A protein has these predicted regions:
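Substrate-gating cap/lid alpha-helix
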Residues: 15-54, 68, 72
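A short helix->loop->beta-strand "cap" motif at the edges of active sites that frequently abuts
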Residues: 2-7
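Charge-rich, low-complexity amphipathic helices
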Residues: 16, 29, 60, 97-101
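Structural beta-sheet core signal
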Residues: 9-11
């Protein structure tokens, strides 16, 4: 369909609140499990994955007041990670995960 195209998965980011759920721990555990499973599966298919480690501490300044969307600073960090990942995938296409899995 699109020759030469590559598929990239952008990990699900954490949130300070989840719509339709009061159990933040259960939602975060599910998010982490999904990210791990997809990363592992997509690696086998030779697809790319971006992991956003900077968001795992869930610092409130990274999120808007609603606790769901990213703040200006959060968006800046997100876009910088996305750009860095794309550069890594272009220059070292054999590294399927950003940041590089060691």
């Amino acid at each position: 369909m699109l020759p030469g195209s590559k598929i990239m998965f952008s990990s699900i980011l954490p949130r300070l609140s989840w719509r339709y759920s009061e159990d933040l721990k259960a939602m975060d555990d599910t998010r982490k499990r999904l990210n791990r499973g997809l990363k592992s599966y997509l690696k086998k298919l030779r697809y790319y994955t971006i992991v956003y480690a900077d968001f795992e501490d869930k610092h409130p300044s990274l999120f808007a007041n609603d606790g769901i969307h990213l703040s200006f600073i959060g968006n800046d960090i997100f876009m910088h990670a996305m750009q860095s990942a794309l550069e890594q995938f272009i220059h070292t296409p054999h590294n399927l995960v950003f940041p590089i899995d060691l």
